[in-house]
Amino acid sequence: MANTNLANAKTAKNDEFYTQYPDIQKEINAYLDYDPNVFRGKTVLLPCDDPEWSNFTKFFAQNFELLGLKKLISTSYAPESKKYKIPYQPTLFETEQPHFNADKSKTHGKIFVLERDVTGDNRINIEDLQWQYLEGDGDFRSKEIRKLRDEADIIVTNPPFSLFREFVVWLVESEKKFAIIGNVNAISYKEVFPLIKDNKMWMGVSIHSGDREFGVPDTYPLEASGWRIDENGNKYIRVKGVRWFTNIDHGRRHEPLRLMTMAENFKHSKHKEIRGQKDYVHYENYNAIDIPFTDAIPSDYEGTMGVPITFLDKYCPEQFEIIGHPHGDYGLELGLKPYPRELKELNKGLRDGDLYYMKDGKPELPYRRILIRKKQSV
C-alpha cells in the first residue's frame, strides 16, 4: 500500500520526499486568491530543503516578483548529517561556483538567498539565486537556522516526517505565518491538536483526500505499490493521507458546510449506515452522537457530535466550535467516563479516555473522532 512509504520514512528516517511543483502552486495560489498581498514585502524561509532539487525553492524564486517578496531564504541539510545515508550528488549550479568545496558540501548545510538582481537583466528570479555554506550542518534546531527563522515572516516547507512534532514546536516558538506538509494523523498529536482547536492552525486548501506523488532520491527503496520511474529515471512514490497545515488564511475555510437536517439524512443520505435509521448512535461514555461521515452532520442538531478527523478539511470556524479530541488523556480531560471492567474483558484493546458505543452487546470504538458543536449564530 502507498501509505507504507510514510511508515518506512519514519522508521528509516529517510525523509527525502520532494513535493511536486503543482501541489505547491495550487496551495500558494489559494492564499493569494484570498489575500493578493499576503506575501508582498515579506521574507520567506524554506528550511529543511534541498534547494538544488527542491520545487519549493524553484516556485518561490520563479515567482519572486509576482509575489512581491522582499527576500527568499532556503537552507539545506548536510548529507553526512542525515540518518539515511545516500550518495551525494552535487549539481552544476553548485560545482560551477568558485567557492565550491567537495568535502565541505558533505559536512555543511547551504543557504540560498534571493533578494536582488544579480545578472543585470532588470528582473529578480531564479537566475539571481546566490548560495554559501552554512557554519553548521543546517539542522533546523540549530542557533544558525533559528536566527534565520526569526528573520523570516513566512515559513514554507515539507519538514521531515520523523521530526514533524518537533518542527511544529519550533514553528510555534517563532509566532510566524507558515504552510507545511504533514500526514493527516498528525492532527492527533499533542503538539498539533490544541493549535487546531484554538484556531491557531488549520488545514490547507489543495489536498483533501487520496494520495500525493513525491519525488525521492535515486537510492530510495521502491517497495510499495504506489511508485513509478519517469523517462528520465527520476523516482516517485505516492503517499496517502497528506495534508497542508497552515495559519495563512484562505477562502474555503470560511465557507459553511451545506448540510441536511437529521430527518433529511435519514431519508436521503447516500450512506447505508445513515439512510433509513431513526436516530444517530449515542456514545456510552460521553453525551454526544456519532457521525461517521462529514456530509451526514445534521444541520438541526444542537448538541455535541463526534465527527471524523477529516472533517477538518471542511471546517468553518464561523459554523462549528471544536470541543476536543476524545482519545486517551485528552478524553479523560474532557470527562469521558472510564470503561467498566466487564467491557474491558470483552475487548482488551479498550483504553480509558476513548469514545465508545455499544453494538450487539459489545463495545465499539469509532476511528479517530473530533467533538464539535454547531454555533448558534449559524
Where are these regions (language model features)?
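Class I S-adenosyl-L-methionine-dependent methyltransferase catalytic core
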Residues: 1-156, 160-378
